[in-house]
Design a protein with these regions (language model features):
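Glycine-rich oxoanion-binding loops at beta->alpha junctions
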Residues: 1, 48-101, 111, 135, ...
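N-terminal phosphate-binding or glycine-rich loops at protein starts, especially the Walker A/P-loop
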Residues: 2-51
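A short, small-residue-rich loop immediately preceding and capping a beta-strand
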Residues: 6-14, 19, 101-110, 176-177
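Short, ordered loop/turn segments at secondary-structure junctions
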Residues: 12-14, 40-46, 78-79, 108-109, ...
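Short glycine/serine/threonine-rich phosphate/pyrophosphate-binding segments
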Residues: 16-26, 47-48, 85-87, 106-116, ...
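Accessory alpha-helical/coil subdomains and C-terminal extensions
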Residues: 37, 94, 102-107, 113-117, ...
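C-terminal non-catalytic interaction/assembly regions of soluble proteins
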Residues: 252-255, 259-429
Length: 429
């Protein structure tokens, strides 16, 4: 441990509630141990250009009460220093030039991967501690430990959906609500289950590629079942944004007006594709074509929860993580000193440090992603309370008759046999 080395901190990826609490706790603890803290603006963006001016020393005045605020006082960026070896080398050289011997990175899976590669390249010149942040909750933390920001995003999403459910009931129409989450359905399921939404669709329930027709079948079946068995024309369907990651590119490219773009880490820019509007259009067309129109309103939840003020859970949580990052850097523990880089987390209330090597996928070399386990009770309980077509609906003659009647109109009659043949694929397996 060298007391002359400074502690640097940067934020990568999308915003999440609690970022400023990490920066605040880290700054207070590092300064109490006689280390300067240098805040680095816009993630890796300037470091990988060799630019050392977008830095400021942080003191008490910079971070006072900032833990209550959403957003990031250091901004954030998706700049990827791992695309080119020379960019990563430039990051290391710039950190050395600034006298930064300890770097805390706050971010999700992409920032964690960049942090792991920097730690590997630095080989001890700069020790790196990653603080896991994402409202997607998809970093591979042990057990069911959430990433910070998730609980705040879930709470705000829950409140929005609660209001939409009341509007849906009052006006007699459906809402299709797409919830942010690039790969995993944690946030969508967390919101839908807590709010008691009519149904929630997540990518993990599909065993292969996701086809938009199959998603529309699920939605259409739910609308018909609610009408047939409860005489209700309203409902709220929560749909995970990450479904789009599983839709074949050629299928997306055939959709008029869709432009496929990727970010600096190679991910599909999901927010540029309005899945909620697309599904609304497709499902409304199905009902209109048989002469029984249905009213659907599309809504997206994501950006409005990312920079919200953190709830108490996240305020408390990130204070421990910010402290933990400094403790990783400056602890006298010889076992920690052996690690050039690690991810800090809380396990059973204790600070733990996970080696980056254990968090990378052995096949891809990239960060592993934590998906929703659809075999666990948490998902099965959520599914139990959804309104979706089930196997018994197609086997019960009375229910099947009511469903077929709901699917009929003056223009087009649907027999029980027709209905069963049409939707049987949803309940197989």
């Amino acid at each position: 441990m060298n007391s002359n080395k400074h502690v640097g901190v940067l934020v990568g990826g999308g915003p999440a509630p609690g970022i400023n609490g990490v920066i605040s706790a880290l700054t207070l603890e590092a300064r109490s141990r006689a280390h300067k803290v240098l805040g680095i603006y816009n993630g890796f963006e300037w470091l990988m250009k060799g630019e050392a001016r977008q830095i400021r020393e942080l003191d008490h005045n910079d971070i006072s009460r900032s833990h209550f605020q959403g957003g990031s006082i250091l901004n954030t960026s998706r700049a990827n220093p791992t695309k080119k070896p020379e960019d990563l080398q430039r990051v290391l050289e710039t950190l050395n030039k600034l006298g930064i011997g300890y770097l805390a990175t706050i971010g999700g899976d992409d920032t964690m991967f960049a942090a792991s590669q920097l730690a590997k390249l630095a080989a001890g010149q700069v020790r790196v501690c990653h603080v896991p942040k994402t409202i997607d909750n998809d970093l591979p933390l042990p057990g069911d430990i959430p990433t910070f920001g998730f609980e705040t995003a879930r709470q705000l999403g829950f409140e929005l959906v609660h209001n939409l459910m009341e509007d849906s009931r009052t006006t007699g129409r459906w809402y299709f609500v797409v919830v942010m989450g690039r790969t995993a359905g944690h946030l969508a399921l967390g919101i839908g289950k807590a709010a008691g939404a009519t149904l929630t669709i997540i990518p993990e329930e599909f065993t292969g590629p996701v086809h938009l027709d199959a998603v529309c079948d699920i939605l259409e079946g739910a609308i018909l079942k609610r009408k047939a068995l409860w005489n209700r024309a309203d409902g709220v369907a929560i749909i995970a944004e990450g479904l789009l990651e599983r839709v074949p590119a050629e299928e997306l490219s055939r959709i008029e007006g869709v432009r496929i773009e990727h970010d600096s880490y190679g991910h599909l820019r999901l927010a540029e594709l309005d899945l909620a509007y697309l599904l609304k259009t497709l499902v409304e067309h199905r009902f209109a074509s048989r002469g029984s129109p249905v009213a659907v309103v599309h809504k997206n939840i994501g950006y409005e929860v990312r920079s919200a003020a953190p709830i108490a859970f996240d305020c408390e949580y990130v204070r421990s993580l910010g402290y933990g990052a400094v403790d990783f850097f400056l602890s006298a523990n010889p076992e920690l000193a052996k690690l050039n880089g690690a991810l800090v987390c809380l396990i059973d209330g204790k600070l733990q440090y996970l080696d980056f090597a254990d968090l990378l996928d052995s096949k891809t070399g990239k960060s592993r992603v934590r998906l929703v386990d659809v075999q666990k009770p948490a998902y099965k309980v959520a599914r139990e309370y959804m309104i979706r077509l089930e196997k018994e609906d197609l086997e019960d003659a009375e229910k099947l008759g009511l469903l077929a009647e709901a699917a009929s109109s003056q223009n087009q009659r649907c027999t029980p046999e027709d209905f069963r043949a049409r939707f049987l694929h949803l309940v197989k397996g």
